[in-house]
């Protein structure tokens, strides 16, 4: 698979207070495509960020029910991946930002 297809797999990193605190343990969190498997997520992270992945955990997040002007709808379902890296590797999210 080319690197461009991997960019379709990994949607965006999740940057919150909680994910920042677990990044000290070499764990990084991403929203991924809902059809992605653990092995393809591992290959995508290794190809995009050039790091060595130790483990991948996946969570399926059910969309919440919301009401807007009396109409009940739901938010989209999402898939979250928590990626654990090897000891000497890390990911710099703001590497290209100046």
UniProtKB/Swiss-Prot annotation:
Q: Does the keyword Ribonucleoprotein apply?
A: yes
Matching Pfam families: Ribosomal_L23 (PF00276)
Q: Which UniProt keywords apply?
A: Ribonucleoprotein, Ribosomal protein, RNA-binding, rRNA-binding
BP GO annotations: translation
Q: Which GO terms describe its cellular component?
A: ribonucleoprotein complex; ribosome
Q: From which domain of life does this come?
A: Bacteria
Q: Which GO terms describe its molecular function?
A: rRNA binding; structural constituent of ribosome
Q: What does this protein do?
A: One of the early assembly proteins it binds 23S rRNA. One of the proteins that surrounds the polypeptide exit tunnel on the outside of the ribosome. Forms the main docking site for trigger factor binding to the ribosome.
On assembly, the entry states:
Part of the 50S ribosomal subunit. Contacts protein L29, and trigger factor when it is bound to the ribosome.
UniProt family annotation = Belongs to the universal ribosomal protein uL23 family.
Q: Which HAMAP family match?
A: Ribosomal_uL23_B (MF_01369_B)
Q: State the name under which the record lists this protein.
A: Large ribosomal subunit protein uL23
Tell me which species this is from: Rickettsia typhi (strain ATCC VR-144 / Wilmington)
Q: Quote the gene name from the UniProt entry.
A: rplW
